[in-house]
Amino acid sequence: MSLFNNAENPRTLPPLAERMRPNTLAAFLGQQHLVAENRLLAKAIKADRLFSIILWGPPGCGKTTLAKIIASQVDAHFYELSAVSSGVKDVRAAMAKAKANRELGKPSILFIDEIHRFNKAQQDALLQAVENGIITLIGATTENPSFEVISPLLSRCQVLKLTSHSKEDLASILEHALSEDLFLSTQNIQFEDKGRDLLLESVSGDARRLLNALEISTSI
């Protein structure tokens, strides 16, 4: 059943934050120091010269979204692991798939969310595949990678620092959700200026918190 079939029943829809996830750099709001034209990520994607990176920034700033956009723009196989629930076995399984892909001439991206939660042995398991180009690693972390990622792995990655969303970016994200989401756009939802400002200020630059709060407030 499609989103269009489910639009009248929000309980059957994916979470709003997932529905509103952009899939191109052009649609991505914020982090213009990385994604604007002629900036590092935009230039790397345009040149199809992908490199391993650590995305370091606060919650809800777009780390996972950027990783997925990068993978789609360069036409690579995308494997996603959470360091909270994955171990060395999962890493090796992903690398085995990436090695098979490479033999077919297809690149692979391994995205590891909360990479700072991997211990030394788990991070060590990534080294050879990163060094040999079997995988392009994208790690996401809220913690300073200089302290949480082992030096040999860190030296093979470019650290990209992301920032919390500005109030202006959050306002754009809010308006986009209200006007473009298949469900919310049918509800004629309006905010008083004071209520809108309170909502934007309450989420501390976190777009995910904003969309979650919007979803909750419009469902009760």
Task: For each feature predicted by the language model, list its residue ranges.
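Walker A/P-loop
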Residues: 1-13, 43-82, 97-99, 127-132
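Dynamic helix-loop-helix/coil hinge segments at AAA+ ATPase domain boundaries and subdomain interfaces
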Residues: 12-36, 80
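Short glycine-rich substrate-engagement loop in P-loop NTPases that contacts/grips substrate
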Residues: 34-39, 76-109, 120
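Conserved catalytic/switch belt of AAA+ P-loop NTPases
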Residues: 42-46, 112, 116-155
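A short hydrophobic beta-strand->loop->alpha-helix junction that borders the nucleotide-binding pocket
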Residues: 57, 79-87, 141-142, 162
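Conserved AAA+ ATPase "SRH/arginine-finger" region at the nucleotide-binding site
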Residues: 82-84, 158-171
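Conserved AAA+ ATPase "sensor/coupling" helix adjacent to the nucleotide-binding pocket
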Residues: 156, 169-185
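C-terminal helical "lid" of AAA+/P-loop NTPase domains
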Residues: 197-202, 208-220
